[in-house]
Amino acid sequence: MVVIGHSQACLVALELNRILKKSLEALIFVAGSNEIPVNQFLLDLSKENPQKASQMMVTWGHGIDGDMSINKWPGHSHYGEGNNIMCMNKSTALRYDLHSCNDYSDGIDAAKIIKVPALAVLAKNDQMTPLKSGLKFVELIKNCETHILDCGHFLPSERPMELNSIINSFLSKLK
């Protein structure tokens, strides 16, 4: 089994490694870190005005390509898509997610015990899980192939072809 996580799901992947050690073949971390501290303003806003908080995150999360006028998908708005997806969640989901990220404290120990091959794909312009934090994270993992893409936090939508190519290459080495 290969577990892949993006952002907060990287913290979940760290914990799954503890639980499923014997079943795992590899771990893939996309725009992740071993810790994801959250600004108090955003934590408060996620309770008071979750829609505004999610709109801010969608804007921060995208790199320069997030704007419809300059992204690689003509006519596509990453901001619009992101906001539509966030509106599908329960109003309390973002608050709980942000608090879970902020409260998670076992990332260093969890990263150090990874024994399976790992892949980390980080983003140069990530404002949600900054590159500096991601690079410190991968240093904790003994066997971690690392790539950095020139985009923001939402690599799967900002650089889908590049991300898929990197993941496919990594997975092909496992066979």
Predicted segments, located by residue:
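Residue-level signal for the nucleotide or nucleotide-sugar donor/cofactor binding architecture
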Residues: 89, 129-132, 158
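Short alpha-helix in the alpha/beta-hydrolase fold that links the catalytic acid
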Residues: 116, 130-139
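Alpha/beta-hydrolase fold nucleophile elbow
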Residues: 1-6
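Conserved alpha/beta-hydrolase catalytic His-Asp/Glu region
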Residues: 38-113
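Catalytic active-site module of serine/aspartate enzymes centered on a nucleophile-bearing elbow/loop
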Residues: 144-175
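Short beta-strand/loop motif that positions the catalytic acidic residue
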Residues: 114, 120-122, 126
